[in-house]
Amino acid sequence: MSIDDLKSKIPDFAKDVRLNLSSMASDETLTPQQKYGLFVACGIASRNADVRKALVAEAAGKVDASVIQAAKAAASIMGMNNVYYRFVHLASNKDYRTMPARLRMNVISNPGVDKIDFELWSLAVSAINGCGMCIDAHEDVLRKANVTAEAIQAAVRFASIIQSAAIALEAADTE
């Protein structure tokens, strides 16, 4: 399955989603590694099998297998961190902010790819998962590494398009 296959599954009520998928596929704001890593990480974070399969297939052959593995790791580790740190951020009891997380997250310091690319993928997944604390932390690392606002915005735009594709497919499944 490819992005074109995925677009063909998007119903007419979500025509804008199809058009956004096309724009995303041809977007050259990011490096290929950043772009296809986002496809994989956000496809997994969408929790939709069709979206995940299409975007992983789209990335295969365009980037090294290590990029795909690292993007999978970003989605996985953010699945954990986003839940934990969203709780810490939203809980009225501020004591949780001073407690050690006691969560293993070694992959963040050694992702097997460029750390900035991994941060970009982590930011996008954090946007999908709605963790403001994680969004701020990853955006801060990216800005300190001189990543442009346009690149950061592109990553979050990709995340929003990918999530909307998953929702469109779920909505179509109700018909």
Curated annotation (Swiss-Prot):
GO terms for molecular function: alkyl hydroperoxide reductase activity; disulfide oxidoreductase activity; hydroperoxide reductase activity; peroxiredoxin activity. It comes from the Bacteria. The keyword Plastid does not apply. InterPro entries: AhpD, AhpD-like, AhpD_core, CMD-like. The active site is at C131 (proton donor), C134 (cysteine sulfenic acid (-soh) intermediate). Its EC number is 1.11.1.28. Disulfide bonds join C131-C134. One of its GO terms (biological process) is cell redox homeostasis. SUPFAM superfamilies: AhpD-like. Pfam families: CMD. It is an enzyme of class 1 (oxidoreductase). Transmembrane segments: none annotated. Keywords: Antioxidant, Disulfide bond, Oxidoreductase, Peroxidase, Redox-active center. It catalyses: N(6)-[(R)-dihydrolipoyl]-L-lysyl-[lipoyl-carrier protein] + a hydroperoxide = N(6)-[(R)-lipoyl]-L-lysyl-[lipoyl-carrier protein] + an alcohol + H2O. HAMAP family: AhpD (MF_01676). NCBIfam families: ahpD (TIGR00777), ahpD_dom (TIGR00778). Belongs to the AhpD family. Antioxidant protein with alkyl hydroperoxidase activity. Required for the reduction of the AhpC active site cysteine residues and for the regeneration of the AhpC enzyme activity. This is Alkyl hydroperoxide reductase AhpD. The lineage of its organism: Bacteria, Pseudomonadati, Pseudomonadota, Alphaproteobacteria, Hyphomicrobiales.
